[in-house]
Structures are given as C-alpha cells and as structure tokens.
C-alpha cells in the first residue's frame, strides 16, 4: 500500500504543478502536469477502490 501513498503524493505535486502553471500562464507545463495528475490520480483512486485502504487480505 506504500506504492499508493507515493503515487498519491505524486498526484498532489502534479496538482500543485497544474495550479502553478496556470498562474504563470505556462501552457506546456499545464499540459504535462495535467497529464501526470490524470494518470497518477486515476491509478491511486482505482487502486484504493480495488484493494481498499488499508489493503484487504
């Protein structure tokens, strides 16, 4: 379950990157941070739904 925590932190940093790139009007940064947020956020949410938190045995 540590992997989900790490990917969740990556998703939070990507959210910070999205907000920062919007504030600085950086289109490429927005696209890359948005893609990272989508991928890692989706993986985190679906893993928690599938396995539960804490991990179901």
Curated annotation (Swiss-Prot):
Entry keyword annotation includes GTP-binding: no
Subcellular location: Cell membrane
Membrane topology: Multi-pass membrane protein
This protein's GO CC annotations: plasma membrane
Pfam family for this entry, one: DUF2759
Keywords carried by this UniProt record: Cell membrane, Membrane, Transmembrane, Transmembrane helix
Family annotation (InterPro entries): DUF2759
Organism, as annotated: Bacillus subtilis (strain 168)
Protein name: Uncharacterized protein YqgW
Residues passing through the membrane, by range: 2-22, 29-49
């Amino acid at each position: 379950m540590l992997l989900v925590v790490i990917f969740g932190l990556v998703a939070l940093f990507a959210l910070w990157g999205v907000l920062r790139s919007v504030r600085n009007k950086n289109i490429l940064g927005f696209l890359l941070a948005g893609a990272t947020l989508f991928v890692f956020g989706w993986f985190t949410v679906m893993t928690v739904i599938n396995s539960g938190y804490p991990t179901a045995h």
